Amino acid sequence: MRWDAEIRIGGRTIAPTEPAYFIADIAANHDGELARARELIWRAKEAGADCAKFQHFLAGKIVSGPGFDELGAQTAHQAGWKKSVVEVYDQYHTRRDWTEALVETCREAAIDYMTTPYDAEALESQLPYVPAVKIGSGDITFDPLVAQAAACGKPVLLATGAADMADVEHAVEQVLARSRQLVLMQCNTNYSGSEENFRSVNLRVLQSFALHWPGMVLGFSDHTPGHAAVLGAAALGARVIEKHFTDDNAREGPDHGFAMNPRTWREMVEATRQLEAALGDGVKRVEANEGETLVVQRRALRLRREVPAGHRLAAEDLEALRPCPPDAVDPRGLGAAVGRRLKTAKAEGDALRWTDLA
């Protein structure tokens, strides 16, 4: 199976040599209000996001009321919800009749529009508007939806939270059987926002993905607080970064508490851009901004005392001291300089140059 090492999303090229592409997952943080959804698009753009992403689901097509009743109690991040799982999904879904308004707002804000669809109809309804399709971690084993997304002719972003390598391999095969355009995303699906989650985010999985699928475009869907994990992921090769986004972490709702806000999002983007600049290209060289320090920090061979022209140099005539002018003999040249005669007289402290030697 083959995959593309470069992928286009909207107007951006996603590749190892390109800046990371930031997806602000607004998800349920519109709180069921179109006006809030549109405002969050603008706030995400202003904070430096490349994409505003939503989630399209209908409660009856994603969760089973009796199934959750059988569990006896809501667990994981759902344990803090004040309503049943079905009620929460029903309250916070993104209405499909909002689509054109959301797309138009994204166009006005000059930010890409994207969604995570959770059923076949949602995917079909959104395809005309999105540059790529995100598959959430929970659907990594939902082959029909994965296959449908892969066959749509647009890049697939595949999240891999709460999955083992066998799960990932299977889902990747489903995509690559139909498309070469895949972004494989490491993810941890604990949404508590606890700092303890740093112990489980396992960024080195990105290295495992890179070894298993060399050249594949990698990404990171993050739910940890702050942006430390994002910086680590970017350093390990993630070129697509997704985090939840809100305008107010204190608002009531399933996703506000662990989301980034405009201030922290901007800080994350700026820190990542600094990191990307710092990573460089891996070629070891004297950098342009080191030219002056090279002179003042390196040592040159210098005369310990005044010597006349014709003097045959001995090791005790020379010492290695800063600075080292560009044409001076550095300490590595001591063996080659000893025993040579001077063409001209040299004063105490003068730097020795190869042109001084006969």
Place the predicted regions along the sequence by residue.
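Catalytic cores and adjacent flexible loops of soluble metabolic enzymes
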Residues: 1-358
